[in-house]
Curated annotation (Swiss-Prot):
Keyword DNA-binding: yes
Skewed-composition ranges (Basic residues): 305-315
Superkingdom of the organism of origin: Eukaryota
Keywords of this entry: Acetylation, Cytoplasm, DNA-binding, Metal-binding, Nucleus, Phosphoprotein, Repeat, Zinc, Zinc-finger
Protein name per Swiss-Prot or TrEMBL: DNA-binding protein REPIN1
Tissue spec. comment: Expressed in adipose tissue and bone tissue.
Job of this protein: Sequence-specific double-stranded DNA-binding protein. Binds ATT-rich and T-rich DNA sequences and facilitates DNA bending. May regulate the expression of genes involved in cellular fatty acid import, including SCARB1/CD36, and genes involved in lipid droplet formation. May regulate the expression of LCN2, and thereby influence iron metabolism and apoptosis-related pathways. May regulate the expression of genes involved in glucose transport.
Molecular function via GO: chromatin insulator sequence binding; RNA binding; sequence-specific DNA binding; zinc ion binding
Pro residues compositional bias, start-end: 345-362
Top-level taxonomy: Eukaryota, Metazoa, Chordata, Craniata, Vertebrata
PANTHER family, sorted: C2H2-TYPE DOMAIN-CONTAINING PROTEIN, ZINC FINGER PROTEIN
InterPro entries in alphabetical order: Znf_C2H2_sf, Znf_C2H2_type
Gene: REPIN1
Length: 567
């Protein structure tokens, strides 16, 4: 009787169901009789509706399907021989030790009087399947996450969220954001905004279909111009702003401006774009490609607008050279096209005229007033009033960093950046918060901290409901759910979700240790390591055990030590 119960299928997926007690102890006829009995009880695995018709017999070990019991029996003999862990009681073999241990509890609990008894609480059951389900109740108490609505417990939070959506849906008052189109309600505002994009796309399709009407097949015939020719030349019109396009793909790409959709993502940094040309132009930053060369000087540019801005420098230089002839140079005769036109004298070279009496001192033709932009950048065409501003700007193109930190040797392109960096070593924090008194080394950090005192948190994560005061914090937090890691180390290829983690990781390759201990000569790459190290110098405030008097450097070691006294 016991051996026959061991051959029953184990419910709920705790162990694989079995059809044979040994590799070669039963014939196909015996197996067929046993299978018919199991089918009458409704416990056969082959009766599952999820299995393919015609191949209803499945192996309990490798999950393969077979058209008949004989083929399954022949396969099971070979499959069981490969399983490494046999049961000493009935000969059944298992692939994993936990399944064998659970199976042996069935033999230990089976008695002729009480049936199957639980070895934890002593409760007895008629069948071993009920015992296995009961053992699951004991293991459920070890699960750390409990449902707040019922007594069920889970190993992971995503299992709890799925359980809450399925068994405990939120009440209507807990979902205050209602869609005006379909009446669907949401708990978070961001979820409603994302849902409304579906209706926007549908409305655009319907409006475009009504405006255009049924279009004839084939290429339209060329007709004479008629009123409303723009509608003929640009038949595809946006239903939101009225802008018209010649081709439907252009309209589809334009509609993403209204819907907020950005389907084109950069594989290097994760930034998203509405159109593929924007992505192509952006990727040149990573590849270093510069396809637009200057015909005058040969300098290459990444984007065409930068080339056009740069070409103006050559035009201005040519114009100034033509407008400023030498003092003794002869006057060239004007060409046939230039003779009728009046020459345009340059303003700086034109002699100043005497102002009429009563004229204001700021006369437009006053030669003393120079143009505001005197110094232009040869790379991008930007102009500056002072030469030092131009030199500071040109460091962005050349990569020059003349300001070096005396503590760690790090270089900077601007002196203000060096001053802000030096506060890391000195510990100076001149910017203080008026609300809580907290101090910061940079003004931008203080400005970001002041928003923490604001009562509202408008940016809500649609996955877990966590709220943030700043949109970049929400974007960085959402990478936890999406698993996106856009920041890649160029030395080893390891990827990170936060840029600060990449900066901290790169110190492993560079050997940089910016955090130095003021009490000794040691330095550290992480600030947390410096804080832990400095506790070793603080002997007066060390963590002391009140029972034996032993001291420790940190509180965690003291708590671990005190557990020995509790035992």
């Amino acid at each position: 009787m016991l051996e026959r119960r061991c051959r029953g299928p184990l419910a709920m997926g705790l162990a694989q169901p079995r059809l044979l007690s040994g590799p070669s102890q039963e014939s196909p006829q015996t197996l067929g009789k046993e299978s018919r009995g199991l089918r009458q009880q409704g416990t056969s695995v082959a009766q599952s509706g999820a299995q393919a018709p015609g191949r209803a017999h499945r192996c309990a070990h490798c999950r393969r399907h077979f058209p008949g019991w004989v083929a399954l029996w022949l396969h099971t003999r070979r499959c069981q021989a490969r399983l490494p862990l046999p049961c000493p009681e009935c000969g059944r073999r298992f692939r994993h030790a936990p399944f064998l241990a659970l199976h042996r509890q069935v033999h230990a609990a089976a008695t002729p009087d009480l049936g199957f008894a639980c070895h934890l609480c002593g409760q007895s059951f008629r069948g071993w399947v009920a015992l296995v389900l009961h053992l699951r109740a004991h293991s459920a108490a070890k699960r750390p996450i409990a449902c707040p609505k019922c007594e069920r417990r889970f190993w992971r939070r995503k299992q709890l969220r799925a359980h809450l959506r399925r068994c405990h849906p939120p009440a209507p008052e807990a979902r205050p954001f209602i869609c005006g189109n379909c009446g669907r309600s949401f708990a978070q505002w961001d979820q409603l905004v994302a849902h409304k994009r579906v209706h926007v796309a549908e409305a655009l399709e319907e409006a475009a279909a009504k405006a255009l009407g049924p279009r004839p097949r084939g290429r339209p015939a060329v007709t004479a111009p008629r009123p409303g020719g723009d509608a003929v030349d640009r038949p595809f019109q946006c239903a939101c702003c009225g802008k018209r396009f010649r081709h439907k793909p252009n309209l589809i790409a334009h509609r993403r401006v209204h819907t907020g959709e950005r389907p084109h993502q950069c594989p290097e940094c994760g930034k998203r774009f509405t159109n593929k040309p924007y992505l192509t132009s952006h990727r040149r930053i990573h590849t270093g490609e510069k396809p637009y060369p200057c015909k005058e000087c040969g300098r290459r540019f990444r984007h065409k607008p930068n080339l056009l801005s740069h070409s103006k420098i050559h035009k201005r230089s040519e114009g100034s050279a033509q407008a400023a002839p030498g003092p003794g140079s002869p006057q060239l005769p004007a060409g046939p096209q230039e003779s009728a036109a009046e020459p345009t004298p340059a303003v700086p070279l034109k002699p100043a005229q005497e102002p009429p009496p009563g004229a204001p001192p700021e006369h437009p033709q006053d030669p003393i007033e120079a143009p505001p932009s005197l110094y232009s950048c040869d790379d991008c065409g930007r102009s500056f009033r002072l030469e030092r501003f131009l030199r500071a700007h040109q460091r962005q193109h050349t990569g020059e960093r003349p300001f070096t930190c005396a503590e760690c040797g790090k270089n900077f392109g601007k002196k203000t950046h060096l001053v802000a960096h030096s506060r890391v070593h000195s510990g100076e924090r001149p910017f203080a918060c008026e609300e809580c008194g907290r101090r910061f080394s940079q003004g931008s950090h203080l400005a970001a901290h002041r928003r923490d005192h604001a009562p509202d948190r408008p940016f809500v994560c649609p996955d877990c409901g966590k709220a943030f005061r700043h949109k970049p914090y929400l974007a960085a937090h959402r990478r936890i759910h999406t698993g996106e890691k856009p920041y890649v180390c160029p030395d080893c290829g390891k990827a990170f979700s936060q840029k600060s983690n990449l900066v901290s990781h790169r110190r492993i390759h560079t050997g940089e240790r910016p955090y130095a201990c003021p009490d000794c000569d040691r330095s550290f790459s992480q600030k947390s390591n410096l804080i832990t190290h400095r506790k070793s110098h603080i002997r007066d405030g060390a963590f002391c055990c009140a029972i034996c008097g032993q001291t420790f450097d940190d509180e965690e070691r003291l708590l671990a030590h005190q557990k020995k006294h509790d035992v």
